[in-house]
Amino acid sequence: RRSVLMDSGADLISYGMGEHSILQIAEALQSGLPVEEITYIPGTVYKCKDLSRAFEPIVLPSYEEVSSNKHTYADSFAVQYRNTDPFTAKPLAESYGTRGYIIQNPPAHPLSQQEMDDVYDLPYTDTWHPMYNAKGGIPALKEIKFSLTSNRGCFGGCNFCALTFHQGRILQTRSHESILKEAIKMTKDPDFKGYIHDVGGPTADFRQPSCQKQLTKGVCQNRQCLFPKPCGNLQVDHTDYVSLLRKLRKVPGVKKVFIRSGVRFDYVVADKSPVFMQELVKYHISGQLRVAPEHVSDQVLHYMGKPSHQIYQTFLREYDKANEATGKKQYAVPYFMSSHPGCTIKDAVKLAEYVRDLGFTPEQVQDFYPTPS
């Protein structure tokens, strides 16, 4: 498919989370600037006849080239992936022949904690749009209505995940005060039964950037924070998350605070302190914890940018020990992925045999299919 901007007839697209760019667009329009002149805002995409407005752009393969050659498409995607960091990204240009170019400006900078708090302090109705009333609402809302977002972004960097394109690899967090304020608001909802279903984000237990360098120089372009092993500069610390969960447990009207999914098991294994694992098992699991090892073949995991199967096994041993110490019998339910590029029949059989030996039938398996992010 062509760019959404080319097909939709829109003048401008705001991509990513959009809070910074949408305000800058509004200010530009309010000042009387014609929309075709708004070509300078990070986190936006615009159309133009030539490259005169783009500052030192990287010219990607044309639309015609990527739509006719899958290897060229992959090359273009790789360039786009390397330009997802707001500190180091360059403008990207894709030619549409006689129709001109699509120019993507670098991503907007991450929000500060105060800005995150301001976003979540807006007067949301916490329900579906009225247009859905006639159809009985949106059933899926029940799953998330009493969940709390504590962070945004993820430095996990899994190769199959589109999160880097949407929220970036630099972690952004809300303050404890902001999250507690929302929890107190939840307790006043007539449908609230005392259970907070989730506290987290793309990765539940990330509460600070992976290292201080990210805040001023951006993320490393050609290496990951956790793969193939944790970076020496990685700050592994669950202290802030544990503190937040303790405060939430004390909110009047809250019976239980659950973490149902999103725990990054290799980050937990890398933490030298056992406190998070102990309190996770003791207070925050409703019978089972969903985790995402994705596969059991180390070769496939390497292609995915995920930790080795041995790391997952280490996590399971520590999880079982913590359950035994607290007198609980709780389960870790794995997410697996089929059809990933590089996964051979032999790898698939190995995964099937592993699942068979676990003695249960997975209810959820993600089947990989390649799509643009």
Feature-to-residue mapping (PLM):
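Catalytic cores of alpha/beta
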Residues: 275-276, 340-356
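Conserved, mostly hydrophobic/aromatic
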Residues: 11, 119, 154, 179, ...
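Conserved alpha-helical substructure of the radical SAM core
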Residues: 167-195
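N-terminal [4Fe-4S]-dependent radical SAM core
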Residues: 72-147
